[in-house]
Amino acid sequence: ITSGKLPAAATGSVTVKLNTSMVMLPKEPMQPRLADERVGFFQNPVTEFSDEQQVTSRGAIIQRYRLEPKDPERYRRGQLTEPKRPIVYYIDPATPKKWIPYLKAGVNDWNVAFEAAGFKNAIIAKEWPDDPTMSLDDARYSVLRYLPSETENAYGPRIVDPRSGEIMESHICWYHNVMNLLKKWYMVQCGPLDKRAQSM
């Protein structure tokens, strides 16, 4: 906050608004899944202790959403079923209106992957409701956050149950200029095959 081009660099001080949000963990933890370095997942490190050890052992479990079928029998037969609790991402109301349909489509396109795993309507994008009791900083709501900044980047912090790796909530934060970064990547990576990329 006190370096670079940020306002605090000139004044030497800044006022910061902080938010703390606490949520109860599920009474029954989700079944954890051990991490495999051959597959790319974010991980929770685990240190194991037991009476039989002379030294602790280390491992990791993957971070993932808890998707449970509403109709287990249908799911076991290999038929698509909706989850008990779908993954819902809200669109930050500060998002430029032009991009909202594309962000919603990008989230909803993930349903193709979830259908391959047996779930339909597993992930949903919604516009932020006009509800004064809801807060973008509330740990109960996953949000696609828009950050009006010249930074060319995006990131995705998550709140995860440390016992199981269950993702309780996630924010996908994208800076305004991330589109310029994507354009550069596309030009470099696809330029040899896509003539449109050669003239970007």
Protein language model regions, located:
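Zn2+-dependent metallopeptidase catalytic core
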Residues: 94-122
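Auxiliary tRNA-acceptor-end handling modules of aminoacyl-tRNA synthetases
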Residues: 1-95, 113, 117, 128-200
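A short glycine-rich, hydrophobically flanked beta-strand micro-motif that places a catalytic Asp/Glu
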Residues: 123-127
